[in-house]
Amino acid sequence: MSRAKFERKKPHVNIGTIGHVDHGKTTLTAAITMTLAAAGGSVGKKYDEIDSAPEEKARGITINTAHVEYETEKRHYAHVDCPGHADYVKNMITGAAQMDGAILVVSGADGPMPQTKEHILLAKQVGVPNVVVFLNKEDQVDDKELLELVELEVRETLDKYEFPGDEIPVVPGSALLALEALIENPKTQRGENKWVDKIYQLMDNVDSYIPTPQRETDKPFLLAVEDVLSITGRGTVATGRVERGALRISDNVEIVGLRPTQTAVVTGLEMFKKTLDETLAGDNVGVLLRGVQKKDIERGMVIAKPGTITPHTKFEAQVYVLTKEEGGRHSAFMIGYQPQFYVRTTDVTGKVVGFNHIQMRNPSSVAEEHSNKMAMPGDRISMTVELINPIAIEKGMRFAIREGGRTVGAGVVTNIVQ
């Protein structure tokens, strides 16, 4: 059996379901695949096929995530659903599954709950740009006014975390009743069942409200240097993977991080021992540079389009601290902790200079007392970090925290201080 070819006929968008435990994220994911399967746009997946999510490793952390794919008339989607709350936190912070938009699932019977708020906050901080709401379990709410109150509360919560609460589409429905109708008759089409129609209505909103993302190739060029070689008579070659953008021969570039920024000219590009005229996002390339010595470049610097990235030493970040079971620390750490911050291709020593907020793994009144003074394994924290050397950092960038070569945390930059 040969592999099916991935055909790029429609724009591709990455989305995911977020929301409080038991509000119906996985049921909705199953209902979407079954609905669109009836329209010929996906392979239907039942609840238990999605719920038994396989483990993945991202930045040294094990995460359970289920990936499904489906198509609407307009787009091709890759959809991620995580079974456990901790998996969401880890997924969003490590960027294991990047989301261009999210479907926030809120039970109409319960309204926004603590994890609803935490997921919205996380989505905001890790840069999920757009959200569409599915107000689930509509069949369990007898009073229409009650449902309207829940919708209002959801919109206010979104506003509070700086999403446009008034504009965001909110679609009421019942994922379970839609799923049951589709299991009974897998060929149910649009217009044949009230609950299945709500799923179509939700996907119409996802199609129209969540914009197609800008492709990595259209962004300004950036390559993280992995290795540096010197070719006698030709110059210096830096190798690495192109993170974004495109680069051509004779382009000017800046070499940023660890030392004062330098400029150079690209005189050649090589991949798989062949020369190229242009390199694109995702390529592993060797860039031949004129105007710099081998000693001037080292692993951990980046080569970028001039003026697009600057070196920094101090930033704020959202961090997930690994538990002992995940191979992390066995004990808490305080302000003043000095681990290595692994950014792109290198470790840089840094110091935790402040905790801004700690979402504890096991909140209790006693724990609240010392909450902003120490971080325990399993906590999610917002912290301020100061590095000993300036490196190219930008908002939304992911990193790992390491100690003696092992990963003890994962983070995402939420704000640059200096």
From Swiss-Prot:
Binding site for GTP: 19-26, 81-85, 136-139
One of the protein's GO biological processes: mitochondrial translational elongation
Binding site for Mg(2+): T26
Annotated segments matching region G2: 60-64
Keywords, in A-Z order: Chloroplast, Elongation factor, GTP-binding, Hydrolase, Magnesium, Metal-binding, Nucleotide-binding, Plastid, Protein biosynthesis
Cross-referenced InterPro entries: EF-Tu_GTP-bd (IPR041709), EF-Tu_GTPase (IPR050055), EFTu-like_2 (IPR004161), EFTU_2 (IPR033720), G_TR_CS (IPR031157), P-loop_NTPase (IPR027417), Small_GTP-bd (IPR005225), T_Tr_GTP-bd_dom (IPR000795)
Domain tr-type G: start-end pairs: 10-214
Residue span of region G3: 81-84
Residue numbers spanned by region G5: 174-176
One GO CC term on file: chloroplast
Location in the cell: Plastid, Chloroplast
Cited function: GTP hydrolase that promotes the GTP-dependent binding of aminoacyl-tRNA to the A-site of ribosomes during protein biosynthesis.
Family stated for the protein in its record: Belongs to the TRAFAC class translation factor GTPase superfamily. Classic translation factor GTPase family. EF-Tu/EF-1A subfamily.
Protein name (record): Elongation factor Tu, chloroplastic
